[in-house]
Regions:
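C-terminal-biased regions
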Residues: 1-96
Length: 96
């Protein structure tokens, strides 16, 4: 499966993205701007305090790692770290 298709599948099934978020992420993804698409997704997840499950986090990290393997794609880890922080904060609140 191509990276573009894998990211689009993630975008399409994400319950956390609004229609405009989907449109923007799809636009970046279709242009081959995979890192930008994933950074946009991470920004939305963190800004909306979305606590991802371990499976959701693993899928997101897998896409990011695949993107990083492409020489000219630079993903800023600060975006993923923000999602992890939110997920850890909110998952610990709900598990108490």
């Amino acid at each position: 499966m191509s990276l573009t298709k894998a990211i689009q599948d993630y975008i399409d099934k994400s319950p956390y993205l609004t229609n405009i978020d989907v449109e923007l992420a799809t636009m970046f993804n279709d242009a081959g701007e995979w890192a930008v698409a994933l950074e946009h997704i991470c920004t939305i997840l963190a800004a909306n305090d979305c606590a991802l499950s371990s499976q959701e986090m693993a899928e997101l990290e897998s896409l990011i790692n695949k993107t990083k393997k492409i020489e000219y794609e630079d993903f800023d880890d600060a975006f993923l770290n923000a999602v992890k922080e939110v997920s850890n904060t909110y998952s610990s609140r709900t598990s108490v």
